[in-house]
Amino acid sequence: MNGEEQYYAATQLYKDPCAFQRGPVPEFSANPPACLYMGRQPPPPPPPQFAGALGTLEQGSPPDISPYEVPPLAEDPAVAHLHHHLPAQLGLAHPPSGPFPNGTEPGGLEEPSRGQLPFPWMKSTKAHAWKGQWAGGAYAVEPEENKRTRTAYTRAQLLELEKEFLFNKYISRPRRVELAVMLNLTERHIKIWFQNRRMKWKKEEDKKRSSGTASGGVGGDEPEQDSAVTSGEELLALPPPPPPGGAVPPGVPAAAREGRLPPGLSASPQPSSIAPRRPQEPR
């Protein structure tokens, strides 16, 4: 046991060369001890039978570093060899690609064709129709679906339609079919024409009714003025009230006594009826 303790003590002293320079009580010092800057003593050479094994181990061992140096990070050749041969060992046909296929960038992706619209009803909307009118329009719109043309009626067609509307404001289905065949029109055209014509007729009737009401209101005020004037004239033409004794002059007619004379007649007796007639002189 004593031999082993001496052996371990000797090895500790060999590994720590500063042990010979340290005192019994450690003292605080801001500077590191000088023994750290001293080179390490080389170990004794190993036996020849272990020289080959130690040589291979020293190739992968980290280099000798000082306490104030940071060792550079180097890639292990075995790990690098494993990284290079990993896809081949796993049997991958293609290496892992990025988020964009075939090396394309976000700006290089082709936009979907705008000329081919997925639904037919999208071509008849106004948003695509007006764009199709221009030469550089990106929307392929058929000419007949671009804009609905307005139906132009001839004079003969309008004459027949007006005659029919004069007799019937609302046309029946059999008569509409007959007119469509006779005028070379569709039933839809005739139906829409009658709807528009009825709206126009109703507006004209409302305008006539409003103008007649306005003229009737203006003419209704005039008779009231005339009646007021005539009533004043009648009051002026009435005879004076009878005397308090109740005696009425003999020339006043009975209608004037009762106050029922017309406005053109006066209550006073005419002088021709009161004055005596003169006898005619012989010639």
From Swiss-Prot:
<keyword id="KW-0805">Transcription regulation</keyword>
<dbReference type="Pfam" id="PF00046">
    <property type="entry name" value="Homeodomain"/>
</dbReference>
<dbReference type="GO" id="GO:0032024">
    <property type="term" value="P:positive regulation of insulin secretion"/>
</dbReference>
<dbReference type="GO" id="GO:0005829">
    <property type="term" value="C:cytosol"/>
</dbReference>
<keyword id="KW-0804">Transcription</keyword>
<comment type="similarity">
    <text>Belongs to the Antp homeobox family. IPF1/XlHbox-8 subfamily.</text>
</comment>
<feature type="modified residue" description="Phosphothreonine; by PASK">
    <location>
        <position position="151"/>
    </location>
</feature>
<keyword id="KW-0597">Phosphoprotein</keyword>
<dbReference type="GO" id="GO:0003309">
    <property type="term" value="P:type B pancreatic cell differentiation"/>
</dbReference>
<dbReference type="InterPro" id="IPR020479">
    <property type="entry name" value="HD_metazoa"/>
</dbReference>
<comment type="subunit">
    <text>Interacts with the basic helix-loop-helix domains of TCF3(E47) and NEUROD1 and with HMG-I(Y). Interacts with SPOP and the methyltransferase SETD7. Part of a PDX1:PBX1b:MEIS2b complex.</text>
</comment>
<feature type="modified residue" description="Phosphoserine; by HIPK2">
    <location>
        <position position="268"/>
    </location>
</feature>
<dbReference type="InterPro" id="IPR009057">
    <property type="entry name" value="Homeodomain-like_sf"/>
</dbReference>
<feature type="compositionally biased region" description="Pro residues">
    <location>
        <begin position="238"/>
        <end position="252"/>
    </location>
</feature>
<keyword id="KW-0238">DNA-binding</keyword>
<feature type="short sequence motif" description="Antp-type hexapeptide">
    <location>
        <begin position="118"/>
        <end position="123"/>
    </location>
</feature>
<keyword id="KW-0963">Cytoplasm</keyword>
<feature type="region of interest" description="Transactivation domain">
    <location>
        <begin position="13"/>
        <end position="73"/>
    </location>
</feature>
<protein>
    <recommendedName>
        <fullName>Pancreas/duodenum homeobox protein 1</fullName>
    </recommendedName>
</protein>
<dbReference type="GO" id="GO:0045944">
    <property type="term" value="P:positive regulation of transcription by RNA polymerase II"/>
</dbReference>
<dbReference type="InterPro" id="IPR017995">
    <property type="entry name" value="Homeobox_antennapedia"/>
</dbReference>
<feature type="DNA-binding region" description="Homeobox">
    <location>
        <begin position="146"/>
        <end position="205"/>
    </location>
</feature>
<keyword id="KW-0371">Homeobox</keyword>
<keyword id="KW-0539">Nucleus</keyword>
<dbReference type="InterPro" id="IPR001356">
    <property type="entry name" value="HD"/>
</dbReference>
<feature type="region of interest" description="Disordered">
    <location>
        <begin position="36"/>
        <end position="66"/>
    </location>
</feature>
<feature type="region of interest" description="Disordered">
    <location>
        <begin position="201"/>
        <end position="283"/>
    </location>
</feature>
<dbReference type="GO" id="GO:0005634">
    <property type="term" value="C:nucleus"/>
</dbReference>
<dbReference type="GO" id="GO:0000981">
    <property type="term" value="F:DNA-binding transcription factor activity, RNA polymerase II-specific"/>
</dbReference>
<dbReference type="GO" id="GO:0000978">
    <property type="term" value="F:RNA polymerase II cis-regulatory region sequence-specific DNA binding"/>
</dbReference>
<feature type="short sequence motif" description="Nuclear localization signal">
    <location>
        <begin position="197"/>
        <end position="203"/>
    </location>
</feature>
<keyword id="KW-0010">Activator</keyword>
<dbReference type="InterPro" id="IPR017970">
    <property type="entry name" value="Homeobox_CS"/>
</dbReference>
<comment type="function">
    <text>Activates insulin and somatostatin gene transcription. Key regulator of islet peptide hormone expression but also responsible for the development of the pancreas, most probably by determining maturation and differentiation of common pancreatic precursor cells in the developing gut. As part of a PDX1:PBX1b:MEIS2b complex in pancreatic acinar cells is involved in the transcriptional activation of the ELA1 enhancer; the complex binds to the enhancer B element and cooperates with the transcription factor 1 complex (PTF1) bound to the enhancer A element. Binds the DNA sequence 5'-CC[CT]TAATGGG-3'.</text>
</comment>
